[in-house]
Amino acid sequence: MAIATIDPTTGITLKTFDAHTPEEVENRIARAEAAFRSLQNTSFEERARWMHKAADILESEADEVARLIATEMGKTLTTAKYEALKSATGMRHFADHAQRYLSPETPVPASEVNASNLHVQFDPLGVVLAVMPWNYPLWQAVRFAAPALMAGNTGLLKHASNVPQCALYLGDLFARGGFPEGAFQTLLVEGKDVIPLVDDARIRAVTLTGSVAAGSAIAEAAGRNIKRSVLELGGMDVFIVMPSADIEKAAAQAVIARLQNSGQSCIAAKRFYVHEDVYDRFEHLFVTGMAEAVAGDPLDESTSFGPLATERGRQDVHELVRDAREKGAAVQCGGEIPEGEGWYYPATVLTGVTEDMRIYREECFGPVACLYKVSSLQEAIALSNDSDFGLSSSVWTNDETEATEAARSIEAGGVFINGLTASFPAVPFGGLKDSGYGRELSAYGIREFVNIKTVWTS
C-alpha cells in the first residue's frame, strides 16, 4: 500500500511512499528496544544537549517546515510556522525541566515508615508507541516525543497517513540532534496495523490522539495487555459569554476560537453559550466576523484559514450542517460547499440548534459554530456538562464569583477565563469522559511514561 501526500487545495497527489513491510516494522521495534538499553543510562545533561540541538535545527528550518505542513494538511503558512516554533519551544522546555520533574522525592521522613532511607524515583518504561493525528502534525508528536525521550524512553511514531513527510521529518530530526540510532523512529503503516503493535510485548506503553473510536480500540488492546496508555480524544468545547464580559473582545476571540486550524482542533470552541442580555450584540459581531473570514490558499498571506485536510472530513462537516438545516436550524452565514477545486468549507454559524440534530452532540471538525442563548451562568454550565466530552472550555466574564463558579463546576480538563483554550509545555493538558484520560505536557505528562519506584532501606 502507498501512503500519499495529497494537496488539500487541489486534491492532487504530490508524493507517495511505500508502507513499511512487516519485516521493516519488526526491525524498527528491535532497534527501539536496543536503543532503550543505551538511552536509559544516559544523563539528563546528555539528553538535554541533544534535545536543544534538535530544537536549534527545527528553528533554523522553520520556514521550510511550515511550507511542508501547509502543503500536507492545509493550515495557513503563518500558523504552520507558529506550530514549528512552538514545537521547538516545547522541546527546549523538557530539555530544561525534565530533570526537575523527575528528580527523586521523599514523600515522608524515612523514620515514619521504619526506614533509614526512603525515596521515590522515576525510571523510564522502555519503548513507547505514539499514534498521532494530522491536525497538528508537528506539535502533537513533539509533545509526546520530547518528554518521552527526556525521561529516557524510546519512541515509535505511527502518524496519520496523510502527513507522511511531517512524520519522516520528525524521525530524522531527533537523530540529527544526536539521540542514539533507533531512539525515535517513524512507522509508515495503516491504521489496521496499530493494534498488533500495542499487542507487542516489547512496546511498554501507548499514547493516542484521535477519535473516540480509535481511542476505544487502543484502550481495549492496552487493557488486554495490562499496558500503560494515555488518550487525548475529541472535544465539544464551550465558549460562554456573560454580560460583564468585554463583548467586542469576546466576539473577536470567538471567531479565532472557532476558525483556528480551519476548525480542525479538539480544543476549538464548538458550542457558544451567550447570555440573553448581550446575545443580540454578540451574535451580530460574531456572525459578521465569521462571514468576513476568508478561506483560501494556505500559502497566501491574505488567507484567514485554509481548506479542510481531507475530502472525507469536508463531507462529514457538511453532512452535520445539512442535517441541522433540514431539522430547522438557521444558517446565519456559510453552510454550502463552494465551487472549484480543493476541500474548502466556509465559516458557518448555526442558530436554533436542537437536541434532535446530530451537531448538537457530535463533534464537528470544521469551521462551524453553534450559537445558543442562555439566561444564566448556571444554565450555560448545565448545557456544557450535558455532553459526552470534557476537554476544555473558555468563559468570558469580569465577575470573579462567576469565574470561580465556572472553574469549579464545568466538567472539563481545563477552564480558561477570558482567554482561548491553548496548550502550553509547562501546563497539563487532557480531558475526561469521552475526551480521554491521562495528561500530556508538564510534570504530569512526563510522569505518565515512567515507573514510579519506591526505594526503602532498612
From Swiss-Prot:
InterPro entries, alphabetized: Ald_DH/histidinol_DH (IPR016161), Ald_DH_C (IPR016163), Ald_DH_CS_CYS (IPR016160), Ald_DH_CS_GLU (IPR029510), Ald_DH_N (IPR016162), AldDh_AldH (IPR054988), Aldehyde_DH_dom (IPR015590), ALDH_GabD1-like (IPR044148)
Pathway(s) this gene product operates in, as recorded in its UniProt entry: Carbohydrate metabolism; D-xylose degradation
Under catalytic activity, the entry for this protein gives: an aldehyde + NAD(+) + H2O = a carboxylate + NADH + 2 H(+); an aldehyde + NADP(+) + H2O = a carboxylate + NADPH + 2 H(+)
UniProt KW NADP keyword = yes
Catalytic residues of the enzyme: 232, 266
* Biological process terms in GO annotation: D-xylose catabolic process
Induction per UniProt is: Is induced by D-xylose. No significant levels of expression can detected when the cells are grown on various other sugars such as L-xylose, L-arabinose, D-galactose, D-tagatose and D-glucose.
Q: Which UniProt keywords apply?
A: Carbohydrate metabolism, NAD, NADP, Oxidoreductase, Plasmid
Q: Which family does it belong to?
A: Belongs to the aldehyde dehydrogenase family.
Q: Which PANTHER family match?
A: SUCCINATE SEMIALDEHYDE DEHYDROGENASE [NAD(P)+] SAD
Assembly, in brief, is: Monomer.
- Which named protein is this? Aldehyde dehydrogenase
